[in-house]
A protein has these predicted regions:
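Cysteine-nucleophile amide-bond enzymes
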Residues: 1-144
Length: 144
């Protein structure tokens, strides 16, 4: 069992190893941070080995997607807000995303994590605030 766990950790670390940045990101992160809304999806051009495989397989520059959930005060439901606090120990004013990462599961991360990455906003057309909160609730329930 320990050998299998060791091998699994090694493979995960190998696949998730990120290459250094080779160029300046193509987006204005400050503008994106201002314009993004809860339930927007951010497409990310990843730099890991698994990202390279995904980009090759899908014939797309995007290898990762994250769900923007806003700041803690943007979450209407107090139970969901508490669950996010259980998974994220940073500042309550931080802009947050939910993402799934190989070897980590579904986690809460600061939007600022992607400041130097090539990212784009993907926004559902005409989504209501209630629908956006439902999408966020669905993602929050899957943390862990």
């Amino acid at each position: 069992v320990k050998l299998f766990e060791h091998l699994q950790k090694w493979i995960t670390a190998y696949l998730m190893h990120e290459k250094p940045r080779t160029n300046v990101p193509f987006c204005d992160f400050d503008k994106l941070s201002y314009e993004i809304r809860p339930a927007d999806v951010l497409l990310v051009e990843g730099r890991s080995r698994i990202s390279d495989f995904t980009k090759s397989f899908t014939q797309s520059p995007w290898s990762h997607a994250v769900l923007y959930i806003g700041r803690l005060h943007d979450i209407d439901h107090p139970i969901l807000r508490q669950k996010i606090k259980d998974f994220y120990k940073g500042e309550p004013t931080e802009q947050l995303v939910i993402e799934s990462l190989l070897g980590c599961g579904t986690i809460v991360s600061p939007l600022a994590k992607y400041k130097m990455e090539h990212i784009r906003i993907c926004r559902p057309n005409g989504i209501s605030k209630a629908d956006a909160q439902n999408v966020i609730a669905y993602a929050v329930e899957r943390l862990g």
